[in-house]
C-alpha cells in the first residue's frame, strides 16, 4: 500500500513506561519531516507481550498529555508543524489490546474526519523485527504502512529482519541520534528502583519531572 505523503497521520504507540528523551526525539523527528498532518500518541494499557507496567496506565496517559502539550506549545517559526494529540483508546479498554485492533479503530476515526487521510504506524526497529510474533500481522500490514525508527548502535541492530519485509511496507526510516539512541524506559525504571532519582530524571524530559516525583514511590 503506497501512502500519499501529503496526507498522513502518524500513530506512535507504546508503553511509554515512562517517556524519556528518545521518545521525545522520535516525535521531534516526525514533526520535522513535515510529512504528517498529525501525530497521535497512544499509550497502551499493557503490552500483550509483557506481564505488567511500572507506572499505571492512567499515569502513562497523563505523561503523554503533558509532553504533547509541552511540544505543541513550544514556539516554532514553522506554522505547518504537525499537531500532537493523545489517544486514550487502549487505556480505556482496561485490558491488553492488540495493535491490529487499535489501528482499525484509529483508521475508522480519522477517515470519518477526512476520507483521504492515511495512517502510518511508527515502530522502533526492535519491535518491527518482532512483528511476526504479533497477532494478525498480515492483516495489520495490509492496513498500514510503517515508519521505522532505527537505533544506530551496532551493525547488527541496524539490520531489518528479512522475514518481515515481505509482510510490511516501510515508507520511511528515521535514525535516532547517538546522544539518545541508548536511552530506554527500562534504564529509567532501574534507576528509579535504585533510588537514583536525579540520574533517572536526567533521561526524562523536564516537563515530566514534577509528575514523576509526585507519582513515583519506592
UniProtKB/Swiss-Prot annotation:
GO terms for molecular function: ATP binding; nicotinate-nucleotide adenylyltransferase activity. GO terms for biological process: NAD biosynthetic process. The keyword Ribonucleoprotein does not apply. It is an enzyme of class 2 (transferase). Catalyzes the reversible adenylation of nicotinate mononucleotide (NaMN) to nicotinic acid adenine dinucleotide (NaAD). Belongs to the NadD family. This is Probable nicotinate-nucleotide adenylyltransferase. It comes from Helicobacter hepaticus (strain ATCC 51449 / 3B1).
Amino acid at each position: 500500500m503506497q501512502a500519499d505523503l501529503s496526507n498522513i497521520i502518524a500513530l506512535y504507540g507504546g508503553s511509554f513506561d515512562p517517556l524519556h528523551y528518545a521518545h521525545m526525539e522520535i516525535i521531534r523527528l516526525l514533526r520535522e519531516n513535515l510529512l504528517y498532518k498529525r501525530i497521535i500518541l497512544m499509550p497502551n494499557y499493557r503490552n500483550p507481550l509483557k506481564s505488567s507496567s511500572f507506572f499505571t496506565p492512567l499515569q502513562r496517559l497523563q505523561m503523554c498529555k503533558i509532553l504533547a502539550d509541552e511540544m505543541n506549545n513550544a514556539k516554532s517559526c514553522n506554522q505547518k508543524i504537525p499537531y500532537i494529540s493523545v489517544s486514550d483508546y487502549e487505556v480505556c479498554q482496561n485490558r491488553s489490546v492488540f495493535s491490529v485492533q487499535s489501528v482499525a479503530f484509529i483508521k475508522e476515526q480519522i477517515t470519518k474526519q477526512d476520507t483521504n487521510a492515511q495512517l502510518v504506524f511508527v515502530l522502533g526497529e526492535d519491535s518491527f523485527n518482532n512483528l511476526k510474533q504479533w497477532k494478525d500481522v498480515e492483516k495489520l500490514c495490509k492496513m498500514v504502512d510503517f515508519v521505522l525508527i532505527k537505533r544506530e548502535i551496532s551493525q547488527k541492530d541496524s539490520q531489518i529482519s528479512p522475514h518481515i519485509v515481505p509482510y510490511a511496507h516501510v515508507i520511511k526510516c528515521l535514525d535516532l541520534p547517538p546522544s539518545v539512541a541508548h536511552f530506554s524506559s527500562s534504564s529509567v525504571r532501574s534507576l528509579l528502583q535504585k533510588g537514583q532519582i536525579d540520574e533517572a530524571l536526567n533521561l526524562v524530559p523536564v516537563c515530566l519531572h514534577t509528575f514523576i516525583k509526585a507519582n513515583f514511590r519506592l
